[in-house]
Amino acid sequence: MNKKWIVIPDVHGRRFWRDAVKGNETERIIFLGDYLDPYEEEGITPEKAFKELQDIIEFKRKHPENVTLLLGNHDLGYLEPAICTVRQDERKKARNRKLLLDNIELFDIISEERFSKQTILFSHAGLRTTWLRHNDWLFDTKNFHPGEINEIFHDEEGRKDLFISLADVSIFRGGFDKSGSVVWTDIEEFIYNNDELPGYIQIFGHTLHTGGAWVIDKHLWCLDCGKAFKVKPSADKSGIEIKEL
């Protein structure tokens, strides 16, 4: 029997992931990152977001073979501030950093999966070939394979170099680099540049929008969308109701 795939977009302290995984613990579950730094207007405190991340880590430990945890720009900002300081919890930076470092072996930057005859690439924001070429000092662009990013990330010395490239931010997000990194790419970068990695369907989050999944040419799927999580009208803003994509 084929497993279901459950993809959890940007959490930011929301609780919708709990309903999504309940009863599906043996299915394939992939979190797209950004667990911390909640939106103030949603009524979620940094403390609540920290607790959700603790529980997500515990969920991963209970189901290590089925659950993949990817990191987003907000999470990585606690490991390297040059990557992101947006909405960062200044008071608890050291605590958040320690939680991530203590469990760093549980996290990846990218995940490559086979589904039928297709190869699907999961990441926080999507992978552009322009970003790879811009960082050819780090990546073997002629023989690149996505798993190379994780290999560098899990090497303590290599991680320092990777963090330099992960801090790349394009003009679409207020930066000056030719391309956003795999944790910073805005979906409009794909729309205007048509430089996604060939041979893959990519599924990512990062670019928040209302409605359902944002699909480009059937092979780029942005899931950081309003239909994935919706505040219950009768509850306070920390109560989240899971919706089907």
Could you tell me what each predicted segment is?
Residues G13-F16, D37-Y39, H74-E80, R128-T130, ...:
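Active-site environment of divalent metal-dependent phosphoester hydrolases
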Residues M1-K3, N24-R28, P64-N66, Q118, ...:
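A general structural motif
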Residues V7-P9, I29-G33, T68-N73, F122-S123, ...:
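Active-site neighborhood of phospho(di)ester-bond hydrolases with catalytic His/Asp-centered motifs
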Residues I104-R114:
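Conserved N-terminal structural segment that caps and organizes enzyme catalytic cores in eukaryotes
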Residues E90-R95, R114-D195:
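Active-site-proximal loop/helix segment associated with metal-binding centers of metalloenzymes
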Residues M1-I6, E113-L121, D217-K218:
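Beta-strand-turn-beta hairpins that frame and shape the catalytic cleft
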Residues I8, G13-D102:
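Core catalytic region of metal-dependent phosphoesterases/phosphodiesterases
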Residues T185-E244:
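Conserved beta-sheet core of the metallophosphoesterase superfamily
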